[in-house]
Amino acid sequence: TAARRRLRSACLRFLTALATSHPAAQDKLQPTLHSFFVDEKGEATATAQLAADEAAHLALEVLRGNRGVCRRVVEETVRAIASSLHRERPSALRLRVLQELCCPQGRPIAANQLHVVRALTERHVALVLFEDGRAERARLRAAAAAGDAAAASRLDYHQELLRTFLCCACGRCAEAEVVLRGVLPID
């Protein structure tokens, strides 16, 4: 309950600090990434969001600049991260985790690109960008410019979603590009 949530939060922060710039720690933590994104039943809204954001910070530090670790991430982990994108509110931070997974050190990993594209597009888990079309995007931009935090958060999410798709399209993963051509008006 409350004590358990505080303990989990402290553990996630400790592991994040441990993984920062330590390849050996990143290597040891990589197999456990999936467990940090599994939804805990019965968590309060704000608490679940905080835990998911702390897990995303940990994942970023585990993956950051470590191609070997990124190559070993399995599709199940990618799907867990993708399914956590909309817990309570859209999360641009968790999209950054997927970007790092696709292109660590700016060099794409084709298998990860395909896993990410599939996870984001198969059930339209992340495609809020296309819900209401152009009018919705214009409304979000205007609301964000006026200081509406919720609109700014959704707009940030949309921008990160496009960056994530860009990370998935760069490189030599033709299958990911084909899927993206079906989702985005590229031509």
Where are the predicted features?
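Elongated alpha-helical scaffolds that mediate protein-protein interactions in large eukaryotic proteins
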Residues: T1-D187
